[in-house]
Amino acid sequence: MSQPRAEHVTKFVFVTGGVASSLGKGLTASSLGQLLTARGLKVTMQKLDPYLNVDPGTMNPFQHGEVFVTDDGAETDLDLGHYERFLNRNLSGNANVTTGQVYSEVIAKERRGEYLGDTVQVIPHITDEIKHRILTMDRPDENGVRPDIVITEIGGTVGDIESQPFLEAARQTRHDVGRENIFFIHVSLVPYLAPSGELKTKPTQHSVAALRSIGIVPDALVLRCDREVPEPLKAKIALMCDVDQEGVISCADADSIYEIPKVLHREHLDAFLIRRLDLPFRDVDWEEWDSLLRKVHEPEHELTVALVGKYIDLPDAYLSVTEAIRAGGFANNARARVKWVPSDLCQTEEGAEKELGNVDAIVVPGGFGIRGIEGKIGAVRYARTHRVPFLGLCLGLQCMVIEAARAAGITDASSTEFDPQTTEPVVSTMAEQMAAVSGEADLGGTMRLGAYPAVLDKGSVVAEAYQTLEVSERHRHRYEINNAYRQRITDGVGLKFSGTSPDGKLVEFIEYPDHPYMVATQAHPEYKSRPTKAHPLFTALVKAGLKHKNDEEK
């Protein structure tokens, strides 16, 4: 084992992609981060996104997938969710940088006169701002500890116009911090052509040539393929791309994303990187990860959880929710299969019965807008009347309150989000959100965002799940429960408002005490779930779902 260096020097690892998008750069980077963490190194991660939006907060979920919210209230790329889950640590908003943020800051500096009359250009001003944000990740954490490694994923594909400033900034970073402190990983596609029965290396060769043409020579290549890349082909790629053969990594499609760290370790990527960067290390501690993989591949139980959503045509729109459901399964030594249910199909009792009659638990996640709302409310009604375990998230809580109010006799109960003129606004716009909703203020970045505390009622279902009375969860919403209706709803159907903000003004948790498990939260607990440490609300949901399944089978 090598000895720690006397002077701390942070190393920077850049992950780029070529040939095609959606190759799994984020999962590759996350898995490498998990491996290096398991070797005792302090790792942090960052995503550079080459789109002009300041953040993904106002982007269509069908295009971008979910928006991942950090503790400090940043709306970020879904890859940050992978980073947090694989590293088992919280990241800040600094971990996601967009072209929109960079240009906004540079233009603001120009208006303030900070460039002293310079002609502001992509090089050096834009690239300098990008480098500043990369190097910012080297700052000490809350415990005063600096990272050993910063892994930065550069979004997009090599050759894209919009990615060029980020790639140039990465190239310059190598010059600024020293070549011995930088490691470039290029993720590339090796397609299999069925008619000829061949794996083709030419796309990777062209992709690496494009990368080299802008001054970046990759230290390692991660070859994505639907099968293992044989050694002779790896040797050919190493020769043609001028990469050490031990730096050519085969990464075939895996049955579970949680197998990828094992795949990269088997190919010795972590050992190769550590040697090249002269990092101190220990052997990989696989105990926790092996325990996870046993639960992934050899669960004792199975159940089906319905996810009733508006954006199910793109599963990435609910990525953290589905991973939290699966993690809840792992915590119960069970395989939780997700059944995707379009919310529109659950509007009627017959439709809900058809879609939800064979499931063991139901989740209604967050979302925006009126489309599909009555179907979500129908799913809530089905869960309540058929005593199916249920968890509502953000909008799911609001739908649960609307359904409860209607069941309590407030037949016109609705939300001002869906019906601004409703006579029974059981869900209403938060006071500080009125300007954004009316169009007088910006929509982007103005919601109630980030971690907020809540106080739970002693003896409540949620307090039992959390095993504490004080919790903190991440939020992303503009609407809240109208307190004027709380008592009427409780008296009418027995719904309990079991958790609020510390001042008691904002409803954070609700539940039916006499239901096997029917809970909802205004927060997004899925963001804090980890594969090795499931979120308590999802663990409790799966536990109740397994009991429901066993009771149904008797």
UniProtKB/Swiss-Prot annotation:
Its EC number is 6.3.4.2. Allosterically activated by GTP, when glutamine is the substrate; GTP has no effect on the reaction when ammonia is the substrate. The allosteric effector GTP functions by stabilizing the protein conformation that binds the tetrahedral intermediate(s) formed during glutamine hydrolysis. Inhibited by the product CTP, via allosteric rather than competitive inhibition. The keyword ATP-binding applies. It catalyses: UTP + L-glutamine + ATP + H2O = CTP + L-glutamate + ADP + phosphate + 2 H(+); L-glutamine + H2O = L-glutamate + NH4(+); UTP + NH4(+) + ATP = CTP + ADP + phosphate + 2 H(+). UTP binds at S21, K200, T201, K202, P203, T204, Q205, K236. Residues 1-279 are annotated as: Amidoligase domain. CTP binds at S21, D160, I161, E162, K200, T201, K202, P203, T204, Q205, K236. One of its GO terms (molecular function) is CTP synthase activity. The active site is at C394, H524, E526. Keywords: ATP-binding, Glutamine amidotransferase, Ligase, Magnesium, Metal-binding, Nucleotide-binding, Pyrimidine biosynthesis. L-glutamine binds at G367, L395, G396, L397, Q398, E417, R478. InterPro entries: Class_I_gatase-like, CTP_synthase, CTP_synthase_N, GATASE, GATase1_CTP_Synthase, P-loop_NTPase. ATP binds at S22, L23, G24, K25, G26, L27, D79. CTPSs have evolved a hybrid strategy for distinguishing between UTP and CTP. The overlapping regions of the product feedback inhibitory and substrate sites recognize a common feature in both compounds, the triphosphate moiety. To differentiate isosteric substrate and product pyrimidine rings, an additional pocket far from the expected kinase/ligase catalytic site, specifically recognizes the cytosine and ribose portions of the product inhibitor. Homotetramer. PANTHER family: CTP SYNTHASE, CTP SYNTHASE-RELATED. Catalyzes the ATP-dependent amination of UTP to CTP with either L-glutamine or ammonia as the source of nitrogen. Regulates intracellular CTP levels through interactions with the four ribonucleotide triphosphates. This is CTP synthase. It comes from Corynebacterium kroppenstedtii (strain DSM 44385 / JCM 11950 / CIP 105744 / CCUG 35717). The gene is pyrG.
